[in-house]
């Protein structure tokens, strides 16, 4: 929500959300838009006092800033907000793929897409280092102004991806790969799955806990257009949680059941199940998006 103050406009809820993701823990945060040495966005989504106040020493993400000179480090008269993200002794960022000079929207978008498409999708058995990521992306496509982009942080560092995969095996007794039915409000759902390594081998020695989250379908939203001269922007979000639970993993296998709530989105579409699992020494992640949800069960049992 836009808040007008004497000097300018602010979005305090957006800043609060940013701080929430910092404190709760995120693997990486990506920002594309206006910015400068003292912060992000004209409305100061992020500024020097905010960065200085972070205390997330155990939850530091990688920060990608497709913006202008956020991390300029050669001005002796001031310390940029990007530098403070690294220098904050109580928290901040584990590293930044960022800018030190004014850049244009075109090269910003190109480099941003290259980082995601070529490296951060983790499509190989070897997780690339931050130095490998940035070197490869800057050398692809003849990027204009590539010297304005830099890496702040340890180039030998790799992101802390979960080591193993969580796989969905069956839904209501039917193999997940063959399940083509739809599920509606008040339906009972039983899901089984297992943990495997990156080579696809079942991990029968994995004993721990799995945390499944079942999301409803994506919905399209539109921005508030607080600036009447701006072009309205549509975007997709998946915020509605239908089930969130804790499941025991025994010998690499897990099983859980739940009822779909009454207040789902009744249109038909693909939901998504996100997984995280861990034990005392290892962790795993995964997702499943082959589950169609919509409508309701007319024969549901009464409470």
Per-range role (PLM):
Residues 1-246, 250-259, 269, 277, ...:
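Cysteine-dependent hydrolase recognition
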Residues 262-272:
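Short glycine/proline/serine/threonine-rich loop/turn segments at secondary-structure transition edges
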């Amino acid at each position: 929500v836009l808040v007008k103050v004497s000097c300018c406009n602010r979005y305090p809820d957006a800043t609060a959300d940013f701080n929430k993701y910092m404190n709760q823990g995120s693997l990486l945060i990506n920002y594309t838009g206006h910015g400068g040495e003292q912060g992000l966005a004209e409305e100061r989504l992020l500024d020097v006092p905010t960065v200085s106040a972070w205390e997330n020493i155990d939850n530091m993400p990688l920060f990608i800033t497709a913006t202008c000179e956020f991390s300029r480090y050669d001005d002796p008269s001031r310390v940029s907000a990007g530098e403070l993200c690294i220098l904050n002794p109580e928290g901040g960022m584990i590293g930044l793929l960022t800018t030190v000079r004014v850049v244009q929207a075109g090269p910003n978008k190109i480099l941003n897409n290259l980082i995601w498409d070529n490296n951060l999708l983790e499509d190989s058995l070897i997780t690339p280092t931050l130095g490998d990521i940035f070197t490869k992306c800057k050398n692809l496509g003849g990027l204009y102004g590539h010297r304005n982009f830099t890496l702040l942080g340890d180039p030998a560092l790799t992101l802390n991806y979960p080591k193993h995969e969580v796989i969905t095996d069956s839904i209501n007794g039917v193999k997940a790969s063959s399940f083509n039915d739809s599920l509606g409000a008040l339906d009972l759902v039983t899901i089984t799955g297992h943990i495997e390594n990156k080579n696809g081998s079942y991990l029968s020695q994995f004993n721990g806990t799995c945390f499944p989250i079942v999301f409803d379908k994506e919905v399209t939203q539109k921005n508030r257009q607080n600036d009447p001269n701006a072009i309205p922007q549509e975007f997709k979000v998946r915020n509605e949680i239908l089930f969130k639970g804790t499941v025991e993993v025994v010998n690499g296998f897990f099983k859980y059941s739940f009822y779909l709530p009454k207040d789902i989105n009744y249109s038909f579409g693909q939901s998504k199940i996100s997984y995280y699992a861990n034990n005392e020494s290892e962790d795993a992640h995964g997702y499943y998006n082959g589950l169609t949800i919509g409508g309701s069960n007319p024969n549901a049992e009464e409470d």
